[in-house]
Amino acid sequence: MIFAKGHGTQNDFVLLPDVAARLSLTAAQVAALCDRRRGLGADGILRVTTADAAVAAGVLHRLPDGVSPGDWYMDYRNADGSTAQMCGNGVRVFAHYLRASGLETRDEFVVGSLAGPRPVTVHHADQTHADVTVDMGKANKLGPGEAVVGGRRLSGVAVDVGNPHLACLDPGLTPEQLAALDVGAPVSFDHAQFPEGVNVEVLTARAAGVVCMRVHERGVGETRSCGTGTVAAAVAALASAGQETGTLTVRIPGGDVTVNITDATSLLRGPSVLVASGEISEEWWRDQRR
């Protein structure tokens, strides 16, 4: 069983090319593969398939709204084995892999997800590096919320980016204080407001068009980056200045991305790196089913 390993601003993934969607992919197998000691190690799994194949194989019960049968489909799983609606960094890496592997030759195409279609533009791609913009769709502000992160109580803005986020901007937080915050510890939030959990971003006030951010992803813990989280952070940073639209650089531990919030949509541009490829032992894979 072949695989590739890649990352988008150090949010890392194992890619499993499975165009016909024939691969068994249990929660236990995903968790084992993502384990950094007994598996390959990753923040998540990206199964590379098509929307019609995913439906035919029962991976999807039906096509997500706006996704066409012939679209590529990113079957994304969190490191704990749960299914996730969207991952902006994952879409960039997914699109990069399609180009690098020769499965796709176009510069512009659509990647389907549980959250709907995500059009991508590949500005550059070689076997190792790529620069990709993802149309993330409209990010919707849902209202205020609160979280406790690393013992610090924070107020934030709930944002739907195809998955739930609580982006907490603390105007008194310096980049140095943000770096020292224990974002990896369990976070507290209102479970009535977020019954399926929430991704929590902590960010500084913007300075010279840049905001610094760290994120605790549901089902994973702290990651070096979160694409949808950077969009939520940009929405919150703009809102704090009384703005609905604008372009910001979001600086996460894994690097910088550019987020453009418009009236109609949100655009996420950033790098992708393909690190390795190889084969997973079939015997090991079978042993992880239980």
UniProtKB/Swiss-Prot annotation:
Record key words, sorted: Amino-acid biosynthesis, Cytoplasm, Isomerase, Lysine biosynthesis
Pathway the protein takes part in: Amino-acid biosynthesis; L-lysine biosynthesis via DAP pathway; DL-2,6-diaminopimelate from LL-2,6-diaminopimelate: step 1/1
Catalytic activity: (2S,6S)-2,6-diaminopimelate = meso-2,6-diaminopimelate
EC class (word): isomerase
Active site: 87, 226
Gene Ontology CC terms: cytosol
Record site: Could be important to modulate the pK values of the two catalytic cysteine residues: 165, 217
UniProt-listed GO biological process terms: lysine biosynthetic process via diaminopimelate
Gene Ontology molecular function: diaminopimelate epimerase activity
Location(s) in or outside the cell: Cytoplasm
Record-linked InterPro entries: DAP_epimerase_AS (IPR018510), DAP_epimerase_DapF (IPR001653)
Family: Belongs to the diaminopimelate epimerase family.
Function: Catalyzes the stereoinversion of LL-2,6-diaminopimelate (L,L-DAP) to meso-diaminopimelate (meso-DAP), a precursor of L-lysine and an essential component of the bacterial peptidoglycan.
Subunit structure: Homodimer.
Name of the protein this chain belongs to: Diaminopimelate epimerase
Native organism: Mycobacterium ulcerans (strain Agy99)
